[in-house]
Protein backbone atom coordinates (compact mmCIF):
# COMPACT_ATOMS: atom_id res chain seq x y z
CA UNK A 1 0.00 0.00 0.00
CA UNK A 2 1.30 3.43 -0.92
CA UNK A 3 0.90 6.12 1.68
CA UNK A 4 1.52 9.74 2.52
CA UNK A 5 2.57 8.57 5.97
CA UNK A 6 4.37 5.33 6.80
CA UNK A 7 4.28 3.88 10.31
CA UNK A 8 6.79 1.12 10.98
CA UNK A 9 6.37 -0.93 14.15
CA UNK A 10 8.98 -3.16 15.76
CA UNK A 11 6.97 -5.15 18.35
CA UNK A 12 8.46 -6.02 21.72
CA UNK A 13 7.07 -7.25 25.02
CA UNK A 14 7.54 -4.01 26.98
CA UNK A 15 7.83 -1.13 24.52
CA UNK A 16 7.18 -1.23 20.78
CA UNK A 17 9.43 0.80 18.52
CA UNK A 18 7.36 3.18 16.37
CA UNK A 19 8.89 4.86 13.33
CA UNK A 20 6.92 7.44 11.36
CA UNK A 21 7.85 8.82 7.97
CA UNK A 22 5.86 11.73 6.52
CA UNK A 23 6.53 11.73 2.79
CA UNK A 24 5.88 15.47 2.53
CA UNK A 25 9.34 16.74 3.38
CA UNK A 26 10.59 13.25 4.29
CA UNK A 27 10.18 14.02 7.98
CA UNK A 28 11.21 11.06 10.15
CA UNK A 29 10.30 10.59 13.82
CA UNK A 30 10.41 7.65 16.20
CA UNK A 31 9.43 6.72 19.72
CA UNK A 32 8.69 3.77 22.01
CA UNK A 33 5.21 3.03 23.32
CA UNK A 34 3.60 0.23 25.33
CA UNK A 35 1.06 -2.05 23.63
CA UNK A 36 -2.17 -0.12 24.30
CA UNK A 37 -0.63 3.27 23.50
CA UNK A 38 0.76 1.86 20.25
CA UNK A 39 -2.78 1.02 19.15
CA UNK A 40 -4.01 4.48 20.21
CA UNK A 41 -1.12 6.20 18.42
CA UNK A 42 -1.78 4.41 15.12
CA UNK A 43 -5.52 5.12 15.32
CA UNK A 44 -4.90 8.82 16.10
CA UNK A 45 -2.45 9.24 13.21
CA UNK A 46 -4.88 7.57 10.79
CA UNK A 47 -7.80 9.67 12.02
CA UNK A 48 -5.82 12.92 11.64
CA UNK A 49 -4.49 11.89 8.22
CA UNK A 50 -7.92 10.98 6.87
CA UNK A 51 -9.26 14.42 7.87
CA UNK A 52 -6.80 16.00 5.41
CA UNK A 53 -7.11 13.31 2.74
CA UNK A 54 -3.85 11.48 3.43
CA UNK A 55 -3.26 7.74 3.33
CA UNK A 56 -1.38 5.91 6.06
CA UNK A 57 0.50 2.66 5.55
CA UNK A 58 1.08 0.59 8.70
CA UNK A 59 3.91 -1.94 8.57
CA UNK A 60 4.65 -4.41 11.39
CA UNK A 61 7.80 -6.49 11.53
CA UNK A 62 6.68 -10.13 11.67
CA UNK A 63 9.63 -11.85 13.28
CA UNK A 64 7.41 -14.90 13.88
CA UNK A 65 7.67 -15.63 10.16
CA UNK A 66 11.38 -16.37 10.51
CA UNK A 67 12.19 -19.91 11.59
CA UNK A 68 15.94 -19.50 11.29
CA UNK A 69 16.56 -16.34 13.32
CA UNK A 70 18.50 -17.97 16.18
CA UNK A 71 19.57 -16.04 19.26
CA UNK A 72 21.57 -18.82 20.91
CA UNK A 73 25.29 -19.16 21.41
CA UNK A 74 27.17 -22.42 21.81
CA UNK A 75 28.15 -21.34 25.32
CA UNK A 76 24.50 -20.87 26.46
CA UNK A 77 23.33 -23.21 29.19
CA UNK A 78 19.95 -24.95 28.96
CA UNK A 79 18.48 -22.39 31.36
CA UNK A 80 19.77 -19.48 29.27
CA UNK A 81 18.47 -21.10 26.07
CA UNK A 82 15.06 -21.63 27.69
CA UNK A 83 14.94 -18.03 28.91
CA UNK A 84 15.84 -16.69 25.44
CA UNK A 85 13.25 -18.96 23.83
CA UNK A 86 10.58 -17.74 26.24
CA UNK A 87 11.45 -14.09 25.55
CA UNK A 88 11.41 -14.58 21.77
CA UNK A 89 8.07 -16.40 21.99
CA UNK A 90 6.58 -13.59 24.08
CA UNK A 91 7.82 -11.03 21.54
CA UNK A 92 6.27 -13.02 18.68
CA UNK A 93 2.95 -13.19 20.50
CA UNK A 94 3.02 -9.44 21.15
CA UNK A 95 3.47 -8.82 17.42
CA UNK A 96 0.64 -11.18 16.50
CA UNK A 97 -1.73 -9.55 19.03
CA UNK A 98 -0.74 -6.10 17.81
CA UNK A 99 -1.66 -7.05 14.23
CA UNK A 100 -4.88 -8.68 15.44
CA UNK A 101 -5.92 -5.54 17.37
CA UNK A 102 -5.11 -3.17 14.51
CA UNK A 103 -7.06 -5.32 12.05
CA UNK A 104 -9.94 -5.47 14.55
CA UNK A 105 -10.13 -1.67 14.26
CA UNK A 106 -10.25 -1.95 10.47
CA UNK A 107 -6.64 -0.90 9.95
CA UNK A 108 -4.85 -2.58 7.07
CA UNK A 109 -1.49 -3.91 8.21
CA UNK A 110 1.43 -4.98 6.03
CA UNK A 111 3.69 -7.63 7.49
CA UNK A 112 7.41 -7.15 6.95
CA UNK A 113 9.88 -9.96 7.45
CA UNK A 114 12.96 -8.86 9.39
CA UNK A 115 15.27 -6.90 7.12
CA UNK A 116 18.74 -8.19 6.38
CA UNK A 117 21.27 -7.23 9.02
CA UNK A 118 24.07 -5.60 7.05
CA UNK A 119 25.00 -2.69 9.28
CA UNK A 120 28.01 -1.69 11.37
CA UNK A 121 26.45 -2.19 14.82
CA UNK A 122 26.62 -5.14 17.20
CA UNK A 123 25.11 -8.26 15.61
CA UNK A 124 25.12 -6.25 12.35
CA UNK A 125 22.20 -4.10 13.54
CA UNK A 126 21.79 -0.52 12.39
CA UNK A 127 23.55 2.16 14.44
CA UNK A 128 22.30 5.63 15.32
CA UNK A 129 24.81 7.20 12.92
CA UNK A 130 23.61 4.96 10.09
CA UNK A 131 19.89 5.61 10.63
CA UNK A 132 20.49 9.37 10.72
CA UNK A 133 22.43 9.05 7.45
CA UNK A 134 19.58 7.08 5.87
CA UNK A 135 16.65 9.19 7.08
CA UNK A 136 18.13 12.56 7.89
CA UNK A 137 16.69 12.07 11.35
CA UNK A 138 17.75 14.83 13.74
CA UNK A 139 17.25 13.05 17.07
CA UNK A 140 20.37 13.08 19.26
CA UNK A 141 19.97 9.50 20.55
CA UNK A 142 17.92 6.45 19.71
CA UNK A 143 17.47 2.89 20.89
CA UNK A 144 17.45 -0.24 18.75
CA UNK A 145 13.63 -0.52 18.63
CA UNK A 146 13.28 3.05 17.35
CA UNK A 147 15.98 2.53 14.72
CA UNK A 148 14.47 -0.75 13.53
CA UNK A 149 10.97 0.77 13.35
CA UNK A 150 12.26 3.77 11.40
CA UNK A 151 14.11 1.49 9.00
CA UNK A 152 10.90 -0.54 8.46
CA UNK A 153 8.94 2.63 7.62
CA UNK A 154 11.70 3.93 5.33
CA UNK A 155 12.05 0.59 3.53
CA UNK A 156 8.27 0.32 3.00
CA UNK A 157 8.17 3.80 1.47
CA UNK A 158 10.48 2.70 -1.33
CA UNK A 159 12.92 5.53 -0.69
CA UNK A 160 16.58 4.72 -1.35
CA UNK A 161 18.75 3.45 1.47
CA UNK A 162 22.13 5.05 0.84
CA UNK A 163 24.52 5.32 3.74
CA UNK A 164 27.57 7.55 3.78
CA UNK A 165 29.81 6.93 6.76
CA UNK A 166 33.38 8.22 6.81
CA UNK A 167 32.95 9.27 3.15
CA UNK A 168 32.23 5.71 2.04
CA UNK A 169 28.94 4.63 0.50
CA UNK A 170 27.49 1.30 1.58
Predicted region positions:
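Phosphate- and other anionic-substrate recognition elements at nucleic-acid/protein interfaces
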Residues: 1-170
Amino acid sequence: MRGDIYIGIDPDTHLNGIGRLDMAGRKATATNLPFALTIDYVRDVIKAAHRVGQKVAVIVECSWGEAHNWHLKLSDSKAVAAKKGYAVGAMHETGKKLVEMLENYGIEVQLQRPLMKCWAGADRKITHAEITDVCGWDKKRSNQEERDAMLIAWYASGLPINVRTNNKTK
